[in-house]
Design a protein with these regions (language model features):
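Active-site-proximal substrate-binding groove within the catalytic cores of carbohydrate-active enzymes
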Residues: 371-390
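Acidic/aromatic-lined carbohydrate-recognition and catalytic surfaces
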Residues: 1-251, 256-257, 264, 268, ...
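Phosphate/diphosphate-binding loops
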Residues: 315-318, 360-377
């Protein structure tokens, strides 16, 4: 730790003293948490109070984790490959289609255990707007389960039962956007300037037109363009996916802190893996496709360090539907290797795994992407997504 950072850390550790394990992890990963955030926000006067609030939330989360979660934190600290072992078997489903409710999922855990499942990914289950809602990815409340599925208490009980059966629980957290009906967006519509600053909005078409010169359309048929005029705001809102999904503004350190706390709260329910939805889109830049920007990886590095300090049992899975040569970066590369996400979707490989048996042909699987170069004959990767989706 650099001397100037050591002095800063000492003040933080003194303020948050009380949990020896937390303080030890904080010292170990403090630089990994601090440095990317300083690079992103260091010149922003809002940063220091938001960073202090984040540290407080991390300390509170670590303190509030029950004995079983603390034990799991310790176990996974000493076995960091727990998610990558060859014995792992994953099962992905929609809770309502599989068992009706979260309680129904609990009742079917013996069946999943019989199958050898060690990892259960329940597709989006947080409260979403009424349809259309992008298959549940237009979230109105990160702190509430979709009412038809149950409650947050049901989610906690399910997570505990899964642990008892030796299974991990994965849930989706939508980082790029919220539904228009989310409390933050509603506050913005009501005139709250602070909450308006949570979103990417523009008073005219000057900047949107500049961005759209190089932006691909995700849903050109049903939601053309990447900006939506909102009369109540008299502003253009960035809407990468649908008009009802408002993109968050991660140049605002308060947004980072708020979404980090969403992740901490989900970790407190006992969730083991957070599937980070649409992560390539988190940072926008004129003259690019506003995907896979370097700042996206700095955000992920800070979130990974946060989890290692406050909730070390929790892993990250990146939903980055990008070309294979761009995908590896979401696991961390160079000096950041292993410091972003633990898993990432390989969309090309997934498609090949399905197309090979259906076409009764395996030749195209032999070289899905040559090392160090683009895939031969590969069409532009689809940047959109369809519901249901992985």
């Amino acid at each position: 730790m650099r001397p100037e950072v050591r002095e800063e850390f000492a003040a933080v550790a003194a303020r948050l003293a009380g949990d020896e394990a937390f303080t030890t992890r904080l010292e170990r990963f403090y630089t990994e948490l601090r440095d990317p955030l300083v690079a992103l926000y260091g010149d922003d006067p809002r940063f220091r109070p938001q960073f202090a609030a984040l540290l407080d939330a991390m300390a509170a989360t670590a303190r509030d984790r029950g004995a079983d979660l603390r034990r799991l934190d310790h176990e996974r600290e000493i076995t960091p490959d727990w998610l990558h072992r060859e014995q792992a078997v994953g099962y992905v489903c929609y809770a309502d289609r599989f068992a009706g409710t979260l309680q129904g999922v609990r009742e079917r855990l013996p069946y999943l255990r019989e199958l050898g499942v060690t990892y259960l990914h329940l597709m989006p289950l947080l409260a979403a707007r009424r349809e259309p809602n992008d298959g549940g990815y237009a979230v109105v409340d990160y702190g509430r389960v979709e009412p038809a599925l149950g409650t947050m208490d049901d989610l906690r009980a399910l997570a505990a039962d899964l642990r008892a059966h030796g299974m991990a629980l994965c849930v989706d957290v939508v980082l790029n956007h919220t539904a228009r009906e989310h409390a933050w967006a509603q506050a913005a519509l009501g005139g709250d300037a602070g909450k308006l600053a949570y979103y990417r909005t523009f008073p005219d078409r000057i900047e949107p037109d500049e961005y759209e010169r190089t932006l691909p359309e995700v849903f050109p048929d049903i939601s053309p363009g990447s900006f939506t005029w909102v009369p109540e705001l008299a502003r253009w809102v960035w809407t990468t996916f649908n008009a009802y999904q408002w993109d968050l503004d991660y140049t605002n350190p308060e947004v980072f802190r708020a979404m980090a706390e969403v992740m901490l709260d989900l970790a407190l329910t006992g969730v083991d893996v957070l599937r980070l939805d649409a992560v390539p889109f988190l940072w926008k830049r004129i003259g690019t496709n506003s995907q896979n920007q370097p700042e996206v990886h700095q955000l992920l590095q800070a979130l990974r360090a946060m989890a290692r300090i406050a909730t070390p049992a929790v892993a990250f899975k990146a939903e980055a539907i990008v070309a294979p040569e761009q995908l590896v970066a979401y696991l961390g590369t160079g000096r950041h290797e292993g410091k972003e996400c633990d898993l990432a979707y390989n969309n090309v490989l997934m498609a090949l795994l399905w197309s090979t048996p259906s076409a009764r042909c395996c030749t195209r699987d032999r070289t899905p992407c040559p090392r160090g170069g683009p895939c031969p004959g590969r069409r532009r990767a689809a940047r959109g997504r369809r519901s249901p989706r992985p």
